[in-house]
Amino acid sequence: MLKSYPFIGLMGYAAGENPLSYPEVKYAMVLQLINAAAKLVDFVILDCSSNMANVFTPAAIEAGDLVIRILMPDLKGVNYLKAHQPLLVDGRFHYNEHLSLAGMARPFHALDEMGYIIGGWDGLLPYGKEIDRCATEGGMFQAIKYCNSRYTASLSKVLKALEQPEENEGSEEEEESADE
């Protein structure tokens, strides 16, 4: 739990830990962990590596109601995605439903060209020195004060996408009640 935000819980490696600090984790165990967490809280946010060989990444993508992919909008970021795309075509990963955001975007990035290669951007998270400083200082919850309008528009799109599954659940429940 975070002292300043007691409604937010975090889980991850402690200082000095790494994947080798623990016994090997199986895919099914990760899915169980995600499902257990989902029963405890309204939202489970999993910040995963983009490495599909890491057992948490494919499990999180499979279990996620909303998958947000943040790419550097340069050849390295786009080529990395294209190299992993064949691993994500399995229907359980719902690849075409992911939101793709251009992260750390700077004016010199060829956003249109990179977006064309991946099928378009759903949002833009421009680089900001102030945001970078908040991350370095461990104050990411303060960073929202420094986000420009393009950044906040992308965040709003994510929030709207998060609300959609709840709206769909409500309409499904109404349909079931009407059928009875």
Q: What label would you give each PLM region?
A:
Residues 1-39, 134-137:
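P-loop/Walker-type NTP enzyme "switch/lid" segment
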Residues 12-13, 45-47, 68-73, 99-104:
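Conserved beta-strand segments of the P-loop GTPase G domain that flank and frequently precede/overlap
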Residues 40-51:
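Glycine-rich phosphate-binding loop used to anchor ATP phosphates in small-molecule kinases
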Residues 43, 66, 120-123:
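Well-ordered beta-strand positions
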Residues 55-74:
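Inter-motif core of Ras-like GTPase G domains
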Residues 137-180:
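NTP-binding/hydrolysis catalytic cores, primarily Walker-type P-loop NTPases
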